Amino acid sequence: MARQNKHSLFPNIYNDSLTQNIEGLDQDNNRISAKIIKEGALTIFLNKQEIVTLMCILDHPIYLAIGYLLNQNMIGKKDKIRSIDFDKDLNLIVVRTNKKTNYEKILKKKVITSGCAQGTVFGNIYEEIGKIKITSKIIIRHEWIYEISKKINQIPSLYLEAGAVHGCVIINKNKPIIYMEDVGRHNAVDKISGYMFLNNINPGNKIFYTTGRLTSEMIIKTVKMKIPILISRSGFTSWGVEIAKKTNLTLIGRAKGKRYTILSGHKRLKY
């Protein structure tokens, strides 16, 4: 099992179902055994309607499915979920709510994002996101940014074992508490979103860290979760920065060692 207690979850590097060993050669023509990530297809149904099939790591299918539906506005935080059923043999998950659902129109209106494996945003999410304003007065101390990166790099992870994955982490002050990985960064953030929703975690006093780029997709998902501070070791896109400024999200990128760049929400940073 992954290391877990109340509101704490980290990667399980001992789960053999997530990796496999493949024989190969190194640069000197020596035979080696390489550990690689297992990627699978997860099909998500909402009530009786098939929504999407995601290529992903199948470690937390329920969190991924719920987070995906939340971030696509297909379920709301006030909706009552009647049941969640996962068929491990078919890699199929069915989420049932009390609402009647018909997403024919919303599924036709989609934007292919810059996310790994072609993330998709449905409906009017881009139009709606500008109406959200993050009002949290949480602060992040200058020294925490370096401490957060250092602590995350020391946590045993699938990335350190095999590479080929992105990571997303929820931070409480300067302490990592929830760490999700996946082959696509949008999947990793959806897992975070689903976990926080199902465990009723307050986002207003948390910090979000991602290994991925700070694109519009990543900013939108962070804002939808109402998390006030987003950090990445990677860089920014112009649309991502624009959305962060409109929604009052603190946006910190290129956080490597003791260096970083902040392009939005400067008031939450304390030196």
What are these regions (language model features)?
Residues 57-59, 65-70, 107-110, 131, ...:
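Surface-exposed beta-strand edges and their flanking turn/coil or helix-capping segments
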Residues 2-173, 178-179:
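Intrinsically disordered, low-complexity regions enriched in acidic/Ser/Thr/Pro/Gln residues
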Residues 185-271:
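Feature captures the catalytic cores and cofactor-binding loops of soluble hydro-lyases/lyases
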Residues 162, 183-186:
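Alpha-helix initiation and capping sites
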